[in-house]
């Protein structure tokens, strides 16, 4: 396919056009008074959503150059979503506004590298300021936990209170998962037996939920082994039995590679529900953790050389089972069945054994690792069961529950800051003392200072108000706890009004926006594919769309 190189003012103009499109479309969803956006689908009616991340992914311009720029800007929202699971709308607003302002300065003849350096200098100052503004969230104050979740869930108090209830049940380090409820229309919290460990899927081809890039297995069998699996022959008998059963298979091994991994992937693509992860931990600790998982899931054996049991002799009765397993690129969560007495007895026996080891151990390090294992086995898993009247309602509500859960975890991890966009607005004042090494570097610093007010401007605009007056009043009061509550239409104390944001979400949104915007700011040219003649002839615009490169 032929392509063309676009640079100079034509490229800068395209940057500004696309950035303005993203700002107006994604920004329209921001805040409690944000709007919904309809996204057309290849089949059925359009999806109507207020999720900024979905809207960002739904923007697909016709012009190849614009499409390439949108894809690059979308990386900011995607990275923000991957890192913290929330803040994608704020990130998109910051990214697009930074690109617009920088592009104007570059078009005026200023040096792009100096501008980028100024932006990077400002970034370091702002990140420190956000950290200094944050305060720890207390798990004793469940109303604060609930409020963070309510804001992220677009004001849904039921979601906020349910997440606070789940956090209360499992604690700060506890595991909370989300699943769709069968039969119920309500949002329920259920405490069940389970475990989470920090190992992700060994191949993205195992993914069952492409939108969330996760593996979700219901009622799977579990094969647990200390061995490294690199040939498929020993696995064939159990794979055949799994295929006949119609249930998924989840493999935990030292590693799965070579022929074994490629064969599992091929069978997954052909319809077999299968996934594999590396075993958690290292050395003797890994062996003990695998025994913990075997107890939790009811597996008869952890397959190892010392047992003398061959993999090809395994039957389904030898494997473990679970209610469900969810795997992301970083973590695995196993939810067991509470009704299984044998499993519960084995888990209790392991818990008592670990407690005895803690009492007799003389090593502080060993005690710490034993306590970690104890917490994983005894802490349980809180399951948020999402119900609704229709499948569409359940899906939309589940998305909001997951966003709110991510925000709550971020708040517990790094604390909270005043919400409503004021954290970034107030942080901008720290740039007044920052000295640039050149006038063009100062332009970069000034761009960041201006862009930091973009989120609150958009929130106020969506409420139908004039932002200049509100921002001027907030700054003059010199009170960093003062916010403008766009829902109640009044000035208020952030904590009293419950308008708070997780510091981690604000930090990641800003940091990611700077990273992606800087990449585009320093882009001199873009190489884009020309549409082929067949596509062009069949388009409504015909060949005329290419005239003067207007098709870009």
From Swiss-Prot:
Together with its co-chaperonin GroES, plays an essential role in assisting protein folding. The GroEL-GroES system forms a nano-cage that allows encapsulation of the non-native substrate proteins and provides a physical environment optimized to promote and accelerate protein folding. One of its GO terms (biological process) is protein refolding. Gene3D superfamilies: GroEL, GroEL-like equatorial domain, TCP-1-like chaperonin intermediate domain. It is an enzyme of class 5 (isomerase). Forms a cylinder of 14 subunits composed of two heptameric rings stacked back-to-back. Interacts with the co-chaperonin GroES. InterPro entries: Chaperonin_Cpn60_CS, Cpn60/GroEL, Cpn60/GroEL/TCP-1, GroEL-like_apical_dom_sf, GROEL-like_equatorial_sf, TCP-1-like_intermed_sf. This is Chaperonin GroEL. Keywords: ATP-binding, Chaperone, Cytoplasm, Isomerase, Nucleotide-binding. It catalyses: ATP + H2O + a folded polypeptide = ADP + phosphate + an unfolded polypeptide. One of its GO terms (cellular component) is cytoplasm. Belongs to the chaperonin (HSP60) family. It comes from the Bacteria. It comes from Wolbachia pipientis subsp. Culex pipiens (strain wPip). Its EC number is 5.6.1.7. One of its GO terms (molecular function) is ATP binding. ATP binds at residues 29-32, 50, 86-90, 420, 501. It is found in: Cytoplasm.
């Amino acid at each position: 396919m032929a392509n063309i190189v676009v640079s100079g003012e034509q490229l800068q103009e395209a940057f500004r056009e696309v950035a303005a499109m993203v700002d107006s479309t994604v920004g329209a969803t921001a805040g409690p008074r944000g709007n919904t956006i309809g996204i057309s689908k290849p089949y059925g009616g359009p999806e109507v959503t207020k999720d900024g991340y979905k809207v960002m992914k739904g923007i697909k311009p016709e012009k190849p150059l614009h499409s390439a720029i949108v894809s690059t800007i979308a990386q900011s929202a995607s990275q923000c979503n991957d890192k913290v699971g929330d803040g994608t709308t704020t990130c998109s607003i910051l990214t697009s506004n930074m690109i617009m302002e920088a592009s104007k300065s570059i078009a005026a003849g200023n040096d792009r590298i100096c501008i980028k350096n100024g932006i990077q200098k400002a970034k370091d100052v702002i990140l420190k300021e956000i950290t200094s503004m944050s305060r720890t969230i207390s798990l004793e104050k469940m109303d604060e936990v609930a409020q963070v979740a309510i804001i992220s869930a677009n004001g849904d108090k039921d979601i906020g209170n349910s997440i606070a209830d789940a956090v209360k049940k499992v604690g700060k380090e506890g595991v909370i998962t989300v699943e769709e409820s069968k039969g119920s229309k309500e949002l329920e919290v259920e405490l069940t037996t389970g475990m989470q460990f920090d190992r992700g899927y060994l191949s993205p081809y195992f993914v069952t939920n492409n939108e969330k890039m996760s593996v979700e297995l219901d009622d799977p069998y579990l094969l647990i082994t200390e061995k490294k699996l690199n040939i498929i022959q020993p696995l064939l008998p159990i794979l055949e039995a799994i295929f006949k059963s119609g249930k998924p298979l989840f493999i935990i091994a030292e590693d799965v590679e070579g022929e074994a991994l490629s064969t599992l992937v091929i069978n997954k693509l052909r319809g077999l529900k299968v996934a594999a992860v590396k075993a958690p931990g290292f050395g003797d600790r890994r062996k003990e953790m695998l025994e913990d998982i075997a107890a939790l899931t009811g597996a008869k054996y952890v397959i190892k050389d010392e047992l003398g049991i061959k993999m090809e002799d395994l039957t389904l009765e030898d494997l473990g089972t679970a209610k469900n397993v969810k795997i992301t690129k970083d973590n695995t969560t196993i939810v067991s069945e509470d009704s299984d007495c044998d499993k519960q007895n084995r888990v209790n026996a392991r818990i008592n054994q670990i407690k005895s080891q803690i009492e007799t151990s003389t090593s502080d390090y060993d005690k710490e690792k034993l306590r970690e294992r104890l917490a994983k086995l005894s802490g349980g898993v809180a399951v948020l069961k999402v119900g609704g009247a229709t499948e569409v309602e359940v899906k939309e509500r589940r998305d909001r529950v997951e966003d709110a859960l991510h925000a709550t975890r971020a708040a517990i991890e790094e604390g909270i800051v005043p919400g409503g966009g004021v954290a970034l607005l107030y942080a901008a004042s720290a740039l007044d003392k920052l000295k640039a090494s050149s006038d063009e570097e100062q332009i970069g610093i000034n761009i960041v200072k201006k862009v930091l007010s973009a989120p609150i401007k958009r929130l106020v605009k969506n409420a139908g108000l004039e932002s200049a007056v509100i921002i001027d009043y907030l700054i003059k009061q010199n009170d960093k706890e003062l916010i403008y509550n766009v829902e109640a239409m009044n000035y208020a104390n952030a904590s009293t009004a419950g308008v708070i944001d997780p510091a981690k979400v604000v930090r990641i949104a800003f940091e990611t926006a700077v990273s992606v915007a800087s990449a585009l700011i320093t882009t001199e040219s873009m190489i884009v594919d020309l549409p082929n003649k067949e596509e062009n002839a069949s388009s409504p615009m015909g060949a005329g769309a290419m005239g003067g490169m207007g098709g870009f």
